[in-house]
Amino acid sequence: MTAVQNKSMSLTPRVCPLCGSSRVSSVLIDEDIRMSELTGLSFASRKAPEGMHYKMAICELCDVAYANPAPDIRWLHDQYVNADFDTVSESRDAAQNHGRLIRSLLGRLPDVDRALDIGAGDGAFLDVLRRIGFRQVEGVEPSEGPLRAASDENQKAIQKGFFSEMDFAVGKYSLVTCFQTVEHVEDVRGLTRRVLRLLKPGGLFLIVCHNFRALTARLLKQRSPIFDIEHLQLFSSASLHYLLDDVGYEHIAIAPFSNHYPLGYWFKLVPMPTRLQDLGQRLLCVTKLSQLYVSLRAGNLYGYGFSRS
């Protein structure tokens, strides 16, 4: 396991990343960061919960929960570039979940000429897009770990680095996707605005993200896995709609998202002492329940909007 890069982190005050307001309705959660416990998996996708997070405030105007203060963006970039990756099977499961959502929306796309996935990981979702019928698929991913795990075809299709519209063709994409990534981006409004410029008329931007107002998050409170050192903001239905509407998307829809994962993965997300977690995982393996697939609405949202036709 890789050691976290440069454990020296500074925090600076921040206004709302969606609307720019400094008006706060409440503090959602207080800071809990233990720098000595950071590892190479701390900034990896679909990891076991660590229980570390920034102080998060809820914006009074747009209802997004955001880290304030937040870490230096250069420090964050270093963590993502050097993050470990050990979730190939879970990456494929996530891609299948997202593929089902895309198939339900295919009839509303202008065509299946070109698609871009922001935060592409090892490219598992690019494989799904090809099977759906997209003629040209591209991705962008900053972390070296998942890129090393990608197939040769996907390594060629994925731009290494952080998303910049300068690297992609303006007005050419029928579909841009961003799955469990908007929580990690410092300037999420800027990203959403730049994606709009990449879409062809009638093109679709699809987001899947955590919902801090979901029942699971409200019940588990600070023990919920959505409160994580990777997350600079968390959304609700209201704030995700605000993000898309304020930037200029049309025909916006927001809804809960169901995930289909093995029981072993779901159990990994349950907050409990390590010894109990290990015992539970062993029991699931012995009883052959670990790979039993279960669909749950565990507290995610999907939201989409179209560019003007």
Predicted regions and their residues:
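Short functional micro-motifs and their immediate structural scaffolds
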Residues: R23-S25, A67
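Extended interfacial segments that mediate partner engagement and assembly in macromolecular machines
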Residues: S45-S143
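Short, well-structured beta-strand/strand-turn elements
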Residues: Q136, E250-I254
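A C-terminal cap/extension of S-adenosyl-L-methionine-dependent methyltransferases
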Residues: T2-R14, D32-M52, A253-S309
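Acceptor-substrate binding/catalytic loop of class I
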Residues: A48, R223-A238
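Short glycine/proline- and charge-enriched loop/turn segments
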Residues: E37-S42, V81-V88, L220-D228, F267-T274
